[in-house]
């Protein structure tokens, strides 16, 4: 099982679309942890450091059976919200 998720910055409304085969809660915690490390020039992590992780929330927007389907749907949702 794969999930497509959306992370929203509640200050400026900017979005990040991603996919995972773990729970979205686990994936969100990974993003938070990565933002605290030396990952530079990554827009999501830069924004989390600038605005604070408490201004971001995650929600599941789709479910996929296969990795291939998840990749296709991730592209679809990125275009949809662009």
Please report, for each region that a protein language model flagged, where it lies by residue.
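Structure-specific nucleic-acid interaction/processing domains
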Residues: 1-82
């Amino acid at each position: 099982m794969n999930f497509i998720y959306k992370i929203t910055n509640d200050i400026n409304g900017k979005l990040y679309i991603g996919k995972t085969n773990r729970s979205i809660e686990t994936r969100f915690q990974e993003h938070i942890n990565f933002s605290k490390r030396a990952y530079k020039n990554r827009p999501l992590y830069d924004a989390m450091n600038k605005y604070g992780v408490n201004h971001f929330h995650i929600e599941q927007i789709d479910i996929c059976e296969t990795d291939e389907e998840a990749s296709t749907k991730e592209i679809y949702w990125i275009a949809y919200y662009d």
